[in-house]
A protein has these predicted regions:
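Glycine/small-residue-rich interface belts in oligomeric ring/scaffold proteins
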Residues: 48-98
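Active-site helix-to-loop segments that bind/position phosphate- or nucleotide-bearing substrates
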Residues: 15-18, 22-25, 72, 84-315
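N-terminal, Lys/Arg-enriched amphipathic/low-complexity engagement segments
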Residues: 5-42, 165
Length: 315
């Protein structure tokens, strides 16, 4: 079974398996189940148990009936290329029974609201970057510089503290010669970061869609070609979970091997401190989006917390 797929259980979520499929021949719908065909063997998983499917292998056939069912169950499908790197996400566009009302509300978000929320999200992100450098006992001057950036973020981050912090952070974490690449992955560090970020992005997309939000309409990102502007906004403080895993596991490696890809998928099940409780990353994401919505509807930031990356424990 390991050659066909792996799955892991998520804590306290209505859908709880992340299915990693490698070199299967066909994925199709059988009643309300995912049917995986591999070398004459059939593997069946109830769709109600699945949150994400990661599919590798260029010869796999996926039926339209299955794609329709994945949308119905709000299951994200991540498709990987021949280098095993994620290149696309298929997700539901109808995850909420009052989608039109939610869209109307989202379109009424004011620029002031969006700028304030982006200020908070940027603070969370730089705070976690600072904590990561502290975890690994990096240069104290760089850590203090991030602290300074964090404490001087304007509404909407008009002075781009996020961008300045990112340069300092990556150069200190992975070395002065490190260059962050998102398209032409030339090294195992970038490959690991991109793979892990794609997993986080898919999970955030399905959670956001499940709450009736349109992922196209962000609070900061506004790329007309990006279907996930809001996802890319909100996932920023969760990226550092992947940074920590990559730093701990890939610095001495040459390739992003299969076991590493599985482990990166499993980061969604890592334990993390969110507010006053410790929960899985997936549960923290869900609570985080709820807190974001509370900020929008009631101007109440008391339930919108920074996920504490320094507390992460791998499952």
């Amino acid at each position: 079974m390991a050659g066909c797929f792996r799955f892991v259980k998520e804590e306290n979520t209505m859908t709880w398996r992340i299915v990693h499929i490698c070199q299967s021949e066909k994925m199709q719908l059988k009643l309300d189940n995912l049917l995986i065909k591999k070398m004459g063997q059939d593997y069946i998983i109830p769709l109600s148990d699945i949150s994400i499917i990661v599919a590798e292998g260029g010869e796999t056939v996926v039926t339209l009936r299955l794609l329709s069912a994945l949308s119905k169950y709000n299951i994200a499908l991540i498709v990987c290329d021949n280098e095993h790197l994620p290149t696309g996400i298929y997700h539901s566009q109808n995850g909420h029974f009052r989608a039109y009302k939610k869209l109307q509300e989202q379109l009424l978000w004011t620029q002031e609201q969006k700028d304030k929320l982006w200020q908070i999200v940027t603070y969370f992100k730089i705070n976690n970057q600072q904590d990561v450098l502290s975890m690994f006992e990096k240069n104290i001057d760089c850590i203090q510089l991030l602290a300074n950036y964090k404490d001087h973020i304007e509404y909407g981050d008009k002075t781009n503290r996020e961008g300045h912090a990112a340069k300092v952070y990556f150069n200190e974490l992975f070395g002065k010669k490190f260059v962050r690449l998102t398209q032409q992955e030339t090294d195992v560090i970038n490959a690991g970061l991109n793979y892990g970020y794609a997993i986080m992005r898919a999970q955030m997309a399905r959670i956001i869609s499940g709450y009736g939000l349109n992922p196209l309409i962000g609070i900061f990102h506004k790329n007309e070609y990006n279907q996930f502007n809001l996802v890319d906004d909100l996932m920023e403080p969760f990226r550092q979970i992947i940074d920590v895993w990559v730093y701990q596991n890939l610095r001495d490696e040459e390739y992003l091997k299969y076991e590493f890809r599985l482990a990166l998928t499993d980061t969604l099940n890592a334990k993390i401190r969110y507010g006053k409780e410790t929960c899985s990353v997936t549960v923290a994401m869900d609570k985080y989006v709820k807190g974001f919505l509370k900020c929008i509807s009631d101007k109440d930031t008391s339930k919108f917390y920074c996920p504490m990356v320094s507390s992460v424990e791998w499952s």
